[in-house]
């Protein structure tokens, strides 16, 4: 077995399959593009689903990749086991209807055992297979595997409900009896017992059958197109080759661990039970790559995952004694380890470090807040005579504030409290079940559309044409090829001026005419067929025949509006880079007829001043009437020109570059104006957050922009009339004066409310009652608003009248309830929660003051009567 670095292992895998005629697919972003079923790219095949389901036909049916992936369902196991990671790399080879079982198995055996490649000892490799899959068993024997090293496993069948399915075969490496102290042997494999001896390194899935839950598996029909989907974990492979005890004892993690040693002053050992080194090393990799790919920490979705990873890493840093912020300092090390194949971490190093540093600083403040919550929780539990923190409370501290159970336990033990570990496990499992249920499982292929996949005719899109003569080559009706169509159908022509929806630009609409100039069909939509042809969805008014020539005419007014928005999107993107920063990467776009919508990565709201400058800059470029050039070239030349490749887009060898003067240059396959002046005008309508670390700008151009400005002008005129401002320029002064008058009136109102409260207080405070050792006042009062209740409570606080005050009032149709307490034995927040249901309300607050709102005034007498009972 050869000695290799992780970079060499990755490269050897790709080189091998390249030598077998595979195209190397570049690793895609961890943030899925146009796939709402995934939170993260979580496997090597996840970015290739479009090929397996037939929606797109690859230029080469043989593919290979090294794909970064994230899975966080079992985050708690990271650091505890030898091989759990949140971010990992999958090496894979894939066949889309090309080779199948025989070649896939032969390739795997050659790569692993040949002296030209990895040169694993054959006697160290064991194979599992599906018992009924005799073809796989026989093929392994044919390539040279000892039959005693072939282990049948009933679970070796890949299936998710109805649809593509098939057997899989897994390759394991035997690390020897040193990792099998009880000498269990092959039983570990046969009975699927968790162990460190037999390490799975490669799984080959044979997508062969069309599963149907209604019939036995043995009767599943075969798929018309059989596919191969394989996955090899790079971290496991490197661990075996480099002889590491765990995946962390390799060149993928050790440089990070060495930096953590310097920060903590503690020496790492593979035999040490201290998992903190491993947790930090794992999590900083995930954070660096995910943030580099445009995800940002937040409170939901993938942003929540990142925030949780960061907080977990910080807490483990504290366990190692690391003081202050430290995580960002590890990013350059991650970048250097991965730079040979993933240069983006070093390229975006400053931005990644800035985000991590800011988030860590925020969390350090959160820790202080969490400490206060724990203290408050313990005080309340003591008051209630309890000596145990319930699992639900532990989980809330863990889930919301990132407090590990160990830290909560340590703080609790200092105060003499026990921990409800079982309750915590129940809450944790419930969350994990919810997380797993939320994941829509997907496999290596979906339903295959044979009709669309069979269309291989040549068809060309004519960028410059608005109308063209075209021959009808293919007609599809109800998913079948036909020679003549009526009604709704899908058509492919030899050429077309109709743009197919792509890259955020909506499709062209228009009409189809016959040789006599009569309209015979309306084009409602245009999409790309699997082989790339423009597929026209139409509603016919007369029959259309394959082989005949028709005139295709786009709706020019619609196209004009769309291209204005598309070119303006390029200008907006450039302006964002100039004003907000280069980290403002496109995360989605839509160029419609009425508006443009642009999503971009940014960690804060764009300020009013920034929006004004963006709008000004875009309009300035529009009025300069810069030429919009389109250049067709190869991808390497385009990158040398400085063309920006957009987020999530995949480009072939030849690309179109859209260059707008010296202001903007991007790779783009869409249609555009000829000059910027044709856009006319640009107006931002809205800026908002749409998710963790993603902002959205909605804007309009041309006539729609003029209408937006006109609407604003009309609104301003109406406001001027309302505030009696002769000119629009005087509105601000008028409104400012009105605000001053309102403040003065409010001040006077507050003074009157205070006097009213004082006048009532003497009468209210006379009625002091007792419930056991607690004195209290409970009264219904008349106040103009909730502030009136607070005013009365303030007066009560200044006097030694009673331990507890309960005030209730009807304000409009609502009921307001206030509870105040000076007694350490009575928590206002708890009491208000007990009383609020009497008026169909709810509320809460602090131990000394709490409020609630309700809707049932009829319950007030019963509420007041219940006070004594609740305090007794």
From Swiss-Prot:
GO CC: one term?
Answer: cytosol
Predominant location category: cytoplasm
Aminoacyl-tRNA synthetase found in the keyword field = yes
Which GO molecular-function terms appear in the entry? alanine-tRNA ligase activity; aminoacyl-tRNA deacylase activity; ATP binding; catalytic activity, acting on a protein; transferase activity; tRNA binding; zinc ion binding
Q: Name one GO biological process term.
A: alanyl-tRNA aminoacylation
CDD domains, alphabetically? AlaRS_core
Q: Where are the transmembrane segments?
A: none
The record, for Pfam families, names: DHHA1, tRNA-synt_2c, tRNA_SAD
Annotated binding of Zn(2+), by residue: 566, 570, 668, 672
- Which superkingdom, per the lineage? Bacteria
Cellular compartment(s): Cytoplasm
Q: Which UniProt keywords apply?
A: Aminoacyl-tRNA synthetase, ATP-binding, Cytoplasm, Ligase, Metal-binding, Nucleotide-binding, Protein biosynthesis, RNA-binding, tRNA-binding, Zinc
Task: From the UniProt record, list the reaction(s) this protein catalyses.
Answer: tRNA(Ala) + L-alanine + ATP = L-alanyl-tRNA(Ala) + AMP + diphosphate
Cofactor(s) annotated in UniProt: Zn(2+)
- InterPro entries, per the entry: aa-tRNA-synth_II, aa-tRNA-synth_II/BPL/LPL, Ala-tRNA-lgiase_IIc, Ala-tRNA-ligase_IIc_anticod-bd, Ala-tRNA-synth_IIc_core, Ala-tRNA-synth_IIc_N, Ala-tRNA_ligase, Ala_tRNA_ligase_euk/bac
Its name, as the record gives it, is Alanine--tRNA ligase
The upper taxonomy is: Bacteria, Bacillati, Bacillota, Bacilli, Lactobacillales
């Amino acid at each position: 077995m050869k000695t290799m670095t992780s970079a060499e292992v990755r490269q050897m895998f790709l080189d091998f399959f390249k030598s077998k005629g595979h195209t190397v697919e570049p690793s895609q972003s961890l943030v899925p593009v146009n796939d709402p079923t995934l939170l993260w790219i979580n496997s090597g095949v996840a970015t290739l689903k479009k090929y397996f389901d037939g929606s797109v036909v690859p230029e080469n049916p043989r593919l290979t990749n090294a794909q970064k992936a994230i899975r966080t369902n079992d985050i708690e196991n990271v650091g505890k086991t030898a091989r759990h990671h949140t971010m990992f790399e999958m090496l894979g080879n894939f066949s889309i209807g090309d080779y199948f079982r025989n070649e896939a198995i032969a390739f795997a055996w050659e790569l692993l055992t040949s002296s030209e490649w990895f040169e694993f000892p054959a006697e160290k490799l064991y194979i599992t297979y599906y018992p009924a899959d005799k073809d796989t068993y026989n093929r392994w024997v044919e390539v040279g595997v000892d039959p005693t090293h072939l282990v049948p496993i009933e679970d070796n069948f890949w299936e998710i409900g109805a649809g593509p399915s098939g057997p899989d075969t897994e390759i394991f490496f035997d690390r020897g009896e040193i990792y099998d102290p009880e000498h269990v042997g092959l039983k570990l494999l046969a009975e699927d017992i968790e162990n460190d001896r037999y390490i799975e390194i490669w799984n080959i899935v044979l997508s062969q059958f069309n599963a149907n839950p209604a019939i036995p598996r043995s009767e599943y029909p075969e798929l018309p197109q059989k596919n191969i989907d394989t996955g090899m974990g790079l971290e496991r492979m490197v661990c075996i080759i480099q002889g590491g005890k765990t995946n962390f004892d390799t060149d993928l993690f050790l440089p990070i661990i060495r930096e953590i040693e310097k920060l903590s002053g503690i020496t790492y050992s593979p035999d040490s039970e201290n998992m903190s080194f491993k947790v930090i090393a794992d999590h900083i990799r995930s954070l660096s790559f995910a943030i580099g790919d445009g995800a940002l920490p937040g409170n939901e979705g993938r942003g929540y995952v990142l925030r949780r990873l960061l907080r977990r890493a910080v807490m483990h840093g504290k366990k190692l004694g690391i003081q202050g912020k430290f995580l960002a300092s590890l990013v350059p090390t991650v970048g250097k380890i991965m730079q040979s194949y993933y240069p983006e971490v070093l390229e975006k190093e400053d931005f990644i470090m800035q985000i991590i540093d800011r988030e860590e600083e925020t969390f350090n403040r959160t820790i202080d807040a969490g400490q206060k919550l724990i203290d408050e929780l313990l005080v309340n539990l003591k008051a209630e005579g309890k000596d145990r923190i319930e699992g639900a409370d532990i989980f809330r501290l863990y889930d919301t504030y990132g407090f590990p159970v160990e830290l909560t336990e340590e703080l609790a033990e200092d105060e003499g409290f026990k921990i409800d570990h079982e309750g915590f496990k129940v809450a944790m499992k419930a969350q994990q079940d919810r997380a797993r249920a939320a994941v829509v499982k997907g496999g290596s292929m979906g339903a295959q559309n044979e009709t669309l996949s069979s269309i291989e005719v040549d068809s060309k899109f004519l960028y410059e044409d608005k109308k063209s003569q075209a021959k009808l080559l293919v007609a599809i009706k109800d998913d079948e090829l036909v020679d003549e169509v009526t009604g709704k159908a899908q058509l492919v022509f030899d050429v077309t001026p109709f743009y197919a929806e792509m890259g955020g630009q909506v499709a062209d609409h228009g009409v189809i005419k016959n040789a006599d100039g009569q309209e015979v069909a309306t084009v409602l939509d245009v999409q790309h067929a699997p082989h790339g042809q423009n597929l026209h969805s139409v509603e016919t008014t007369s029959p259309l025949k394959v082989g005949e020539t028709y005139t295709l005419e786009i709706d020019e007014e619609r196209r004009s509006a769309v291209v204005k928005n598309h070119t303006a999107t390029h200008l907006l993107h450039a302006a964002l880079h100039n004003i907000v920063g280069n980290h403002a990467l496109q995360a989605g776009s839509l160029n419609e007829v009425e508006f443009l919508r642009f999503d971009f990565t940014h960690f804060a709201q764009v300020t009013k001043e920034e929006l004004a400058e963006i709008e000004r800059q875009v309009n300035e470029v529009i009025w300069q009437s810069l030429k919009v050039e389109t250049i067709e070239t190869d991808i390497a030349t385009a990158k040398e020109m400085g063309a920006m490749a957009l987020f999530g887009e995949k480009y072939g060898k030849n690309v179109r570059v859209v260059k707008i003067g010296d202001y903007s240059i991007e790779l783009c396959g869409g249609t555009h104006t000829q000059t910027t002046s044709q856009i006319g005008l640009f107006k931002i309508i809205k800026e908002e957050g749409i998710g963790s670390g993603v902002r959205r700008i909605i804007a309009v151009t041309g006539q729609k922009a003029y209408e937006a400005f006109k609407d604003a002008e009309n609104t301003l005129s109406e406001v001027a009339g309302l505030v009696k401002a002769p000119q629009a320029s005087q509105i601000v002064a008028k409104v400012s004066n009105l605000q001053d008058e309102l403040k003065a009136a409010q001040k006077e109102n507050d003074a009157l409310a205070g006097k009213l409260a004082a006048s009532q207080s003497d009468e209210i405070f006379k009625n002091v009652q007792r419930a056991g050792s607690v004195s209290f006042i409970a009264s219904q009062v008349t106040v103009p608003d909730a502030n009136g209740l607070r005013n009365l409570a303030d007066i009560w606080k200044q006097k030694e009248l009673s331990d507890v005050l309960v005030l209730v009032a009807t304000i409009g149709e609502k009921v307001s309830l206030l509870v105040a307490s000076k007694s350490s034995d009575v928590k206002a927040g708890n009491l208000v929660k007990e009383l609020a249901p009497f008026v169909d309300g709810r509320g809460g607050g602090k131990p000394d003051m709490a409020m609630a709102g309700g809707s049932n005034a009829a319950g007030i007498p019963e509420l007041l009567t219940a006070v004594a009972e609740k305090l007794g």
